[in-house]
Amino acid sequence: MLTLLLCLAALAVSASSCTGGKNEADDPTRVRVGIVFDIGGKDDRSFNAAAFEGVKRAERELGIVLRDVEPGNPTSIEPAMRAFAERGYDLVIGVGFAQAPIMEIVAKDYPHINFAIVDGVSQLPNVASLVFKEHQGSYLVGMIAARTTRTGKLGFVGGMDIPLIHRFATGYEEGAKAVNPNISVYRNFVGVTDSAWNNPGKGKELALSQIGKGADVIFTAAGNSGLGAFDAVEQAGKGADGRATHFVIGVDSNQNMVKPGYVLTSMVKRVDNAVYDIVNDVKNKRFQGGIHVFGLDKDGVAFSLDQYNQPLIDPSVLQEVEAARQKIIKGEIQVTDAMAK
C-alpha cells in the first residue's frame, strides 16, 4: 500500500505546478526543493501563499528546481513528503503546524535529507523549525484596531481552535486593551479540524455575528476561511462619508488589496523570507536544523502599510504603534505568548 501511495505522490510531484522542463528535477547540479502545502492550497492569499512567494523567489534568484504539491486531503501529505525524499531532494518543506507530526515520522526515515517545517517544531537534527512570534505582530494590529473602532467592540475570527491561533487572539486583545482597557473583543473559531482553514462560508457567518454584536473591526487568522470575514465587512457597506463602516484585518501575507478600503491592515508573517532563507542556506551548504524564531526584532512579523490602507490610519497612530514596536523589541513591553502558558 505504501508503495502505491509513493507512486501516486510521485505522479503528483511530477505534475505539480512549477517552471522548468521534465528533466530538471534530475539535474544533480541544481538544488532541488519540494514543498507540500496544507489543504488551504497555495492560492489562499494568506499563509500558504506567503510560503509560495518565498520558494518562487528562490526559484527566480537562486536557480533552484522547484516542485510543489497541494494535497487534496491530509492523507496525501505523508506520501508527498516521502516521494520528494525518495527522489533525493535537497530540501523538503512542509507548510503548517499540522504537518509537523508527519514530518517527524518521514524525517526519521531519511536522516540525510534536509527538511523544514513552517509553524511546527521538531527536535530532529535534519529538520529546521521555522516559527514566528505572532503575538507580537498581533499586539500592534490590536492597537490600530482600538484606535480605529467607533463602537469600542472588536472581533477575532480564528481558524482551527488551537494554541497557535490563540497566540494571535491574545496578542490582539492585549494590544487593544493597552489603548483602551474597557474595549470588548469577541472571539470565535471556525472549527476544530483541518477543514477549519478552508471554510469561508463559516468565516463570514462568524464575522457577521460579531458585527451584529457591534464589532466594527475584525481580525482574522483563519487561512482561506478568513476570506469570509472580508466579504462580511464589505457587505456592511459604507457610511455617508464614503468610508467603510466596518474593517477587517488580514493575516500572514499582505491582504490589503483583497477588499480595498475595507482592510485596515494585515498582520504579516514573513513566511516568504523564512522559506527563502532556508532554501538559500541549503544552496550555500549551511543548513542547520533546530528552531529558527522570527519576531519583530528580525522583521519576522509586522503590519502592512501601503497605498490601499494608508488613508485609513492616522499618522499619530502609526507613531504610537512604532513606539510600542520598539518597546517590544527592547523587552519593555512583554506580550503574552498563549503557547507558552
Task: Identify the function of each model-found stretch.
Residues 1-5:
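Bacterial N-terminal signal peptides that target proteins for export
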Residues 6-12:
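Core hydrophobic alpha-helical transmembrane segments of single-pass membrane proteins
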Residues 13-17:
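C-terminal motif of bacterial Sec signal peptides marking the signal peptidase cleavage site
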Residues 22-341:
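A residue-level marker of the well-folded mature domains of exported/periplasmic proteins
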